């Protein structure tokens, strides 16, 4: 019996101990699996059946003074509970306190000894109420969680050793949160963690290349905007060396692969472009290697193994033999076979040439046998190569996010990601601080080490947790104890769980995160697709659960609304951001995420039932008052967002949100995703708030969605402009003459608005007749004038030089215009791409004078116009039949420019002009 155990330890058993042992069945973060022990039952039989791995001495404990404990060290039943003075911030729970203290709190002690045997249980003590409700609430909020430094210092110090014991991996460090998503920490946390664990160096700032990362010819480039053209990326990366391959199939998912021929070019590109701005986002570059694939060319590996070489041939002699094919990076005898020579070239083309020239060559009476191989240090072990389908290596995929995000896994491990039907391997740092991997800016969908073959049926492009019912992970088949799911709750529900004896001990937490498979299996990632795509249970909901409910931000549907007029403030847990008080109910957010919060979802914001959005803590520390400080100037409009408190309405009817991409973290502020900023109409809101006047209690300053989109787009374009981005479109004659820039499509700016296509052609033909095959002068149909710019495609890059000298920086002759022509590159390059862009455009319904013009470049008709090919799926202008477009143009009754047309009257072309 538990009382016998307590007597053996010399601790008196409280009189109420036998009646008040409660172990809740509701799963909490850090709790043991619920089916291990039924509710309201405890004792030797059930505890002894638990796996011994859950009770090892390695389970690291948090400090007693930082725990939420109701026991006194003396063990006296009359001893008062001590109060921890640590300052704590948490956004796990909403601030509803309606039924917080409806009964006495029975709090469980959390300072369980690490050497406690499997049949030992912890005692519950009854908390005596304080003098006032305010004092109880304030003290409880402040003491909910342990101190941040203590948590990370102690947990991370033990997790590495526990992981090696459980998995057999000989990792120098273990990433505490790597298997369950990225997390950012401030620099002082790095220092404290490294200092406490006695480790030096390796603390890389966010975004820098990891020291110890193995260089390779292939770079995985993250934070790539989907609207960046392929030729822009090619120009950007080609300046460092010849590119072997550019994989952009996953560009819409936020990353690309760039393979260089020379490994030195890849290193130079990684160093030069790391953290450089491209379309307003910082590039994140990692080295990666190609997975061994039979379909790949064997000559692209960059290294050779030389067999059947006479032992009298020294390495120096062999070096002289092979260096004629290219520079040799390394040449040596292999460790496992002294007769085998390993040769690595800087350039894969040199390796291919050496393979073709030396294989079968007779040297000292023996024919050389050369076998292509991957550079050592980047190949997979034979065990992983054989068992790769069984989850030997963690796998990474990218979800559909606008900015694109890259997952991080265990330091020193290699993860794979899909690209062009094949897969790539990402090499991560094997040295450095114990938490340097989970502080990256990326989120990932990962399958941890140790998953059985049944997990292979899960599509890599599909978020874990949204799989079909027939392909979900079965914990019983894995032979592991699953990590209980995370259910964010209001504070009242959280305390109720404590009252029922829910164990949130440091040992359970450290035991849980010590095994990567446990830590990741308990989280089910939901890629939220509006209201219908969200599982009612929030993050961690069972995959078989099919219930749906609307997404509520900052509120819990099971709790009552906090009185907005209350002046209650929490001394240890701030409930406002940037001095925005809680009396402003329409916007209520928390100032930072809790230290132990795990970012699992891949979307820019994670919607949790009953909790504030989980955002990286350094973002909140930037103290940018973008929330509720100035609703109109900041672009943060209540009408576009869900779960905002509305006076006179209950939280059970929150304002619905239009999409899961409500917020996005961009730079150092919180932006509203412009593509999903939807203003609910009064009719729509009336369905959400039956019996109420939904707009009566709302702020009156609502602008239209189009105006809001323009404001947000203008602010985003200003913040994203950079010199590096502009250089992509600058025309450099010297690079053209050297053959380094092969683009042919130009944008002619500052054209007088009275110029027609015929006048422009006449001016061009005076200097460069027959050198171009495409011309397009966009027309504003309102005033029948051009919009100030045109696009021309030269037949060869060399033809740009005389065209540039004839027009760039020159004034136009007609109309006494003061405009000075300037030339830049266009976004869309090449005649083929231009035709594909316009052939299905609504321009094909307009008068021929408004369409792009093509020209013959060969034969006797060179220089003459040719018909523009019509597409099979031509778009029509909204509200206007196709047949009436030409008549309307001729009668000067053209309506305003439609949203589908590529030209705009303000002088900017969203498809062809640079951003």
UniProtKB/Swiss-Prot annotation:
Residue ranges occupied by any RRM domain in the UniProt entry: 217-290, 302-375
Leader sequence segment: none
InterPro entries: MEI2-like_RRM1, MEI2-like_RRM3, Mei2-like_Rrm_C, Nucleotide-bd_a/b_plait_sf, RBD_domain_sf, RRM_dom
Tissue specificity statement from the Swiss-Prot or TrEMBL entry: Expressed in roots, shoots, leaves, flowers and siliques.
Disrupted gene: phenotype observed: Early flowering.
Compositional bias segments (type: Basic and acidic residues): 16-25, 705-723
Compositionally biased spans, kind Low complexity: 66-77
Protein name, as recorded: Protein MEI2-like 1
Organism, scientific name: Arabidopsis thaliana
Taxonomic lineage: Eukaryota, Viridiplantae, Streptophyta, Embryophyta, Tracheophyta
Gene that produces this protein: ML1
